[in-house]
Amino acid sequence: MTTIGIVGCGAIGQALLKASEVGSLTLPITGIASRTEESARAFLATLNDPPEYCSQTELIAKSDLIVEAAGGDVIPELAYETFQSGKDLMAISVGALISHPEILDMARERRCKIYAPS
């Protein structure tokens, strides 16, 4: 089964975690990483069975699919690290892909997938 790691614990990241908690999201969440560790940990503490908080590097290592929910400015670095590890990326901030076409080339070269929800 595909496991997901979430980068970002704002409105979208929290919605995904809540969906997982009530069973609406059936893929296992291996962890979460965020630029705002303190607030992310505070939110995780409100969940009954929270995933582990971890560094972005740890998250990528233990997840099959990385879900970016942190804003477009993290996409270039996150995509690079994700694709270097041979993992796939779901970019919630799809506009960043237009601003950084090299990300598409990198995914192609590494045979990784980019999912862009609409």
Spans of features found by a protein language model:
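Residues that mark the start of a beta-strand
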Residues: 1-3
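NAD(P)-binding Rossmann-fold cofactor-contacting core
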Residues: 23-44
